[in-house]
């Protein structure tokens, strides 16, 4: 059984470490039942131990040593790389925020330490980086390039691409997409990333594949609705997305998207995307949606869905983790890391736009090109969790 090192900022109840590492330790709840792990968590490095820390108890229960450095976790206390894969979960913990309201998690530092062990050992193993690569483009690009330089299979990103779509929408490769909108909620840094990945995992499947992003603008408040009236994002698509969401179908967008913000994304091939955020969660909605205008010169149709994330036991993280495990077992990423490289850069550009007074930010550096997956090994296909996916863990 392959041995995996878990490199964590902190491990407490419902943290990302809990809902990811916990499944590698206890098994993966899926709609078809519990699936035992095919790999073993062999070591942990934990950066912080809050009062609600779970890492020590879980490590003791599953006989996993916690090491005092990332190098030791990867070498199992020896002199060279001794594991077959690395989970980097740099989410949650007591870290500062900057003037862009980005949470300064040490993901680049974690990756730098991991890659140092790879370089010193003369070989690399697969790495998964939870959520966006870093809070800034320079670090994210370094992480991506360093993994490629060392030959490390690399995955990253949100669990949203593995969420429950209702109704099921999955564009075929080379679909003629004209325009798309994703809807999300909560903070622009912490959850705006999830909404961006909801959008990007869909629109990367358009004709010609992904070409990169030319410019990004962030708007807030009444400027969001003014932009809709000016045709800068499609109200029709946003309404199509909310029409699929129980409780808000038919409700005016102004009553759904409280404290609104929008990311206007201009792709290099002329495609337009938008991410709408309900920033004020009190009284607003708390889910995700997607809609696109699909069709060539002969006409078009709107395709839309809700993207639902279940509560305890958080099955969307099961499907995310199963795809990561697939990479650990096969050595092949389940979907392209370039998606998350691009969404990392889009998010930074949006927050820069906001900080500078909601100006348009040109992004010539986001010339990220790639082709989407043929298929994803593990994912739900129903509208809601069932079976083990809907059974809370004790």
What are the residue ranges of the model-derived segments?
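Rossmann-like dinucleotide-binding domain that binds NAD(P)(H)
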Residues: 180-272, 278-284, 342-345
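Short amphipathic alpha-helix with an adjacent loop that forms part of the alpha/beta core around
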Residues: 73-81, 168-171
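Short acidic-hydrophobic, aromatic-tinged amphipathic segments that line or gate anion-handling sites
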Residues: 65-74
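N-terminal Rossmann-like NAD(P) cofactor-binding module of classical short-chain dehydrogenase/reductase
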Residues: 83-90
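C-terminal helical cap and adjacent loop that interface with cofactors, partners, or active-site loops
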Residues: 53, 283-394
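N-terminal Rossmann-like dinucleotide-binding module
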Residues: 1-61, 180
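Beta-strand-loop-alpha-helix segment that lines the small-molecule cofactor/substrate pocket
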Residues: 91-161
């Amino acid at each position: 059984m392959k041995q995996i090192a878990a490199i964590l900022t902190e491990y407490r109840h419902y943290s990302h470490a809990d809902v990811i590492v916990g499944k590698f330790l206890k098994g993966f709840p899926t709609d078809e039942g519990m699936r035992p792990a095919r790999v073993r968590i062999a070591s942990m490095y934990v950066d912080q131990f809050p009062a609600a820390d779970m890492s020590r108890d879980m490590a003791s229960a599953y006989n996993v040593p916690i090491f005092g450095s990332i190098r030791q976790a990867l070498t199992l206390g020896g002199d060279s790389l001794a594991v077959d894969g690395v989970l980097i979960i740099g989410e949650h913990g007591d870290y500062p925020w900057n003037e862009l309201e980005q949470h300064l998690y040490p993901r680049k530092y974690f990756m730098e330490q991991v890659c140092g062990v790879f370089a010193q050992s003369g070989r690399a193993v697969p790495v998964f980086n939870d959520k966006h690569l870093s809070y800034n483009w320079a670090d994210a690009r370094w992480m991506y390039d360093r993994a490629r330089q060392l030959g490390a299979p690399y995955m990253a990103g949100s669990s949203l691409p593995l969420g429950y779509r209702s109704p099921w929408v999955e564009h075929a490769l080379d679909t003629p997409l004209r325009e798309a909108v994703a809807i999300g909620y909560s903070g622009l840094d912490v959850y705006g990333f999830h909404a961006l990945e909801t959008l990007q995992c869909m629109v990367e499947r358009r004709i010609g594949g992904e070409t990169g992003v030319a410019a990004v603008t962030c708007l807030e408040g009444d400027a969001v609705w003014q932009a809709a009236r000016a045709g800068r994002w499609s109200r029709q698509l946003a309404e199509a997305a909310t029409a699929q969401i129980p409780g808000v179908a038919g409700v005016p967008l102004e009553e759904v998207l409280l404290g609104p913000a929008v990311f206007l994304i201009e792709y290099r091939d002329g495609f337009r995307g938008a991410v709408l955020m309900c920033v004020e969660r009190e009284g607003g909605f708390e889910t995700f949606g997607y809609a696109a205008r699909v069709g060539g010169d002969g006409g078009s149709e709107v395709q839309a869905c809700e993207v639902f994330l279940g509560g305890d036991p958080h099955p969307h993280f099961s499907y995310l983790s199963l795809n990561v495990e697939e990479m650990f077992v096969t050595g092949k990423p389940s979907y392209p890391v370039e998606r998350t490289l691009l969404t990392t850069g889009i998010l930074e550009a949006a927050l820069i736009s906001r900080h500078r007074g909601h100006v348009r930010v040109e992004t010539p550096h986001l010339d990220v090109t790639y082709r989407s997956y043929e298929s994803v090994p593990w994912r739900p296909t129903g509208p809601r969790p069932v079976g083990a996916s809907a059974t809370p863990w004790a």
